[in-house]
Curated annotation (Swiss-Prot):
This is D-aminoacyl-tRNA deacylase. Its EC number is 3.1.1.96. GO terms for biological process: D-amino acid catabolic process. The keyword Ribosomal protein does not apply. SUPFAM superfamilies: AF0625-like. Binds 2 Zn(2+) ions per subunit.
């Protein structure tokens, strides 16, 4: 997310009945006197009534998006700066129409959260709120930014100035790299979604908290996706029942909407989302039901699969799984998990790298095995020689099963009567051959 020379035109709306919104607007005017960059891209409108009761179609339309500057109120007041889009999943208790959602300015919301985190005064929390209240029937993408939660905060000029600075920064940001997400689950104050936006390119539009999931229908799910412009959804599974999570997952599958977790988003880095989806689709065609883990990928315009010997990967995963997976971060590849395996022998990389990557992965596996076993090659076969504890040999030497076996397996000698038994005396060598076709000498 970077500053952008050509920004969308934004309509800033505050209410004369709202002390916090008016104060934020006042501070914005002050900033704009000194910073002319945004003048041509900002329109101002001061409503006479409360914002939540505005009539959407009556609002000015000479802009690309709307940002409402507002106070925040709560039954459990605390100093907080929030961002959310409007709409009602059910009844319209606080403005707007029931069962109606507005288009979300999802990219702007991502920018606002991150700039608020930078500028928030000490003692103020920053977070998304779940979708709630009016106005609805707004034809333009929009969102609220709020300062709360009591008269003390509404009249806090330092906080209002911080919000104004965050707004001005966000309006000038290029948000084209943001991945629009719809969120499901959690409380009204969407802490998990806020954390995701803080750490990743994932930005949320509509967020349906757990309390509103009983309202969810197929039609409403589609409305949430379209009103957000969502590329994918995030499910806070820990905050809901298994039945609720399965219902949401089923709707996502039905409408071919990807489900992304925080880990997925953390690994996306700057990878274009279209390329990420190409990788996911290829992985699904290779191993249905698998999950993907990205490693150091900035772009992958031509994803292809490569396969190395499955026995080789299995051997490495038995003895050096953590080291192997960690080492994959140095490769521009994707590994697949699931269906009983932490790493399948099928990988995805860009076509430009596939030949080299295949050789390097095999070399990595062999190196990790050589650190633990005696390994050699005969032609295209890797020979792995292992020493394993042989209970028959131990028994023949008069060693009773139990703690002494553990000592020997740990490489320690033991005493039986007047005799000292060394570990190598109770070991048997086994040999495993793995065919590695077209292995290149290194």
């Amino acid at each position: 997310m970077t500053p952008k020379e050509q920004s969308p035109t934004t309509l800033l709306i505050s209410s004369r009945k709202d002390p916090a919104g008016s104060l934020i607007h006042e501070e914005l005017y002050s900033f704009l006197e000194d910073d002319k960059r945004a003048h041509s891209h900002i329109r101002h409108w001061h409503a006479e009534e409360r914002l939540i009761y505005l009539d959407g179609p009556s609002l000015p339309h000479d802009a690309d998006r709307i940002l409402f500057l507002s106070r925040h109120a709560s039954e459990r007041p605390r100093p907080v700066l929030t961002v959310h889009v409007t709409g009602n999943f059910g009844s319209a208790d606080y403005g707007g129409r029931p069962n109606t959602l507005t288009p979300a300015a999802t990219g702007l919301m991502h920018a606002l959260i991150n700039r608020l985190i930078i500028h928030a005064p000490e003692g103020y929390e920053v977070m998304y709120e779940a979708t709630h209240h009016g106005p609805t029937d707004i034809p333009l993408p929009s969102c609220f930014i709020e300062l709360g939660s009591t008269e003390k905060e509404w009249n806090d000029r330092i906080a209002a100035r911080a919000v104004a600075q965050a707004v001005l920064d966000a309006l000038l940001m290029d948000t084209s790299s943001v991945i629009p997400l719809a969120g499901f689950g959690g409380t009204h104050y969407a802490q998990r979604q806020t954390e995701i936006t803080k750490l990743t390119r994932g930005g949320f539009g509509h967020i349906m908290p757990t309390r509103d999931i009983p309202h969810l229908t197929d039609a409403l799910f589609q409305d949430i996706i379209s009103s957000t412009g969502a590329f994918a959804i995030y499910i806070d599974g820990k905050s809901m029942s298994g039945k609720e999570e399965r219902m949401i997952t089923g709707l996502a599958d039905k409408h071919t909407i990807p489900i992304l977790g925080q880990g997925d988003l953390m690994r996306l880095f700057d990878l274009p989302f279209s390329e990420y989806m190409s990788i996911r689709n290829l992985a699904e065609s290779l191993i249905p039901g698998s999950s993907i883990v990205l490693h150091t990928i900035l772009e992958m315009p031509a994803p292809v699969s490569l396969t190395i010997p499955g026995e080789l990967v299995d051997e490495v995963m038995k003895v050096a799984a953590e080291e192997f997976i960690s080492a994959l971060d140095s490769f521009p590849i994707v590994h697949m998990t699931g269906r009983g395996k932490a790493c399948h022998p099928v990988f995805i990389t860009d076509a430009a790298f596939s030949g080299r990557i295949s050789d390097e992965l095999i070399h990595l596996c062999v190196t990790l095995l050589q650190d633990r076993y005696t390994c050699s090659f005969e032609g295209d076969s890797l020979i792995i020689k292992k020493l394993r504890f042989d209970p028959k040999k131990a028994k023949n030497l008069g060693i009773p099963s139990g703690p002494l076996y553990s000592e020997l397996m740990a490489g320690k000698p033991v005493e039986v009567g007047d005799s000292v038994i060394y570990p190598e005396m109770v070991m048997t060598e086994t040999e495993k051959r793995i065919h590695i076709p077209q292995r290149q000498a290194r």
